[in-house]
């Protein structure tokens, strides 16, 4: 089974990806792991990516696409199938993935899209607070400190609601054309992500069993 998982930051995509890998035994291909492995193994694309990263530059699409292609061409993929997590990030990368899969004789079986209302995501992502003395991390709603005094805690700039909302807006603008592309191919299953983790996975599992 060859899959792609999508969802905005805070939707619980990483948690569900780990559960899919455990339950279905597919190879988990996350962008970060893929880059680290390619650079550690000094593949052609890995060396190229490292040259950009060492200069503090963004890795261009053609290198990212090349690293994905190298990984998808490995033996375990034909045997186990894959779950792509964190790629494609743009519609151009989605088209490149289509071409790569065709070239390697693989096909995408499904796209799992974990949907959570953006306002819920802002609450999830902007609730993080840090104790000034201990550095411990808490969440205002989901994991509040026992003796909360506002002056004892601070919030990172990245976690402030307005920053989180801007980040989500950027992600939504990138994800929409990708989802539209895969909807036209009838590959997308939307999963309600604003429920308990076990309930989300029950819906994911049901969708994937129907694909098999």
UniProtKB/Swiss-Prot annotation:
One of its GO terms (cellular component) is cytoplasm. ATP binds at residues 10-15, 128, 137-138, 195. It catalyses: AMP + ATP = 2 ADP. Pathway: Purine metabolism; AMP biosynthesis via salvage pathway; AMP from ADP: step 1/1. GO terms for molecular function: adenylate kinase activity; ATP binding. Coiled coil: none annotated. Keywords: ATP-binding, Cytoplasm, Kinase, Nucleotide biosynthesis, Nucleotide-binding, Transferase. The keyword ATP-binding applies. Consists of three domains, a large central CORE domain and two small peripheral domains, NMPbind and LID, which undergo movements during catalysis. The LID domain closes over the site of phosphoryl transfer upon ATP binding. Assembling and dissambling the active center during each catalytic cycle provides an effective means to prevent ATP hydrolysis. It is an enzyme of class 2 (transferase). Catalyzes the reversible transfer of the terminal phosphate group between ATP and AMP. Plays an important role in cellular energy homeostasis and in adenine nucleotide metabolism. It holds the Pfam family ADK. It comes from Streptococcus pyogenes serotype M6 (strain ATCC BAA-946 / MGAS10394). Monomer. Belongs to the adenylate kinase family. This is Adenylate kinase. AMP binds at residues 31, 36, 57-59, 86-89, 93, 156, 167.
């Amino acid at each position: 089974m060859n899959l792609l998982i999508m969802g905005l930051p805070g939707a619980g995509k990483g948690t569900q990806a780990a559960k899919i890998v455990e339950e279905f035994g597919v190879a988990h291909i996350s962008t970060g792991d893929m880059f680290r492995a390619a650079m550690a193994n000094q593949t052609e694309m890995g060396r190229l990516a490292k040259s950009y990263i060492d200069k503090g530059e963004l890795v261009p699409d053609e290198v990212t696409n090349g690293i994905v292609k190298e990984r998808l061409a490995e033996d375990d993929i034909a045997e186990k199938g894959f779950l792509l997590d964190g790629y494609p990030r743009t519609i151009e990368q989605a088209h490149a993935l289509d071409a790569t899969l065709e070239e390697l004789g693989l096909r995408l079986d499904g796209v799992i899209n974990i949907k959570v209302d953006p306002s819920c995501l802002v609450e999830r992502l902007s609730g993080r607070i840090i104790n000034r003395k201990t550095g411990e991390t808490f969440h205002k709603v989901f994991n509040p400190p026992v003796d909360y005094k506002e002056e004892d805690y601070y919030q990172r700039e990245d976690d402030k609601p307005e920053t989180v909302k801007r980040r989500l807006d950027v992600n939504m603008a990138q994800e929409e054309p990708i989802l539209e592309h895969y909807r036209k191919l009838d590959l997308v299953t939307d999963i309600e992500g604003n429920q308990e983790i076990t309930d989300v996975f029950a819906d994911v599992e049901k969708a994937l069993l129907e694909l098999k």
